[in-house]
């Protein structure tokens, strides 16, 4: 998996189709040096069969379901490639921007698979234990010096899977190791929330043929209650056809 990810990363860099993100992007926290960015490899579902098992990993999925409920939807699957000299990402919550008020329960959970060893030296993700129970605070307050001191840098070997719920404050650290640190993030939602990646639109045809019916459920190819039907009716993942035409104008 690490070899396939590195190949994909280098290929996207070569053809300049990869994504970049500033450490402060979207959070209202100003930074000074434009070049300090993280590279992202989005939508890994299309980029190697080895990534498909992360949709419903048998050891991980039950933990996600324990946290946010039996029915889950994959929000996104992508890799963070943090080079030496990257900008430290602002502390943030994955769940809070989706709703305008604090929630007493998580509807989102994140799994981070460590493709590299993680340590404070190479910018291991910073987490604030217990912050999922905090009252709502804004991003500038959360990134004040007093709050930053509460963050703990992740230290764990490659191959580890780290799981946290969507209300926990976290963010990438500063990489000063001289090497790239890579992690794969798979985020899950309760299925009433719109995912980050539109899987029905973005999954390539040759990949769709390899995905199991269980995985299609998790990718949102089936309705949730009365949500997500086609022409008002439910469609099972087995019968899902993105090219199926909807009923148009008719006359007697």
Role assignments for model-derived ranges:
Residues 62-63, 88-155, 193-203:
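Catalytic core of non-heme Fe(II) oxygenases with the double-stranded beta-helix
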Residues 1-91, 97-98:
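Non-heme Fe(II)-dependent double-stranded beta-helix
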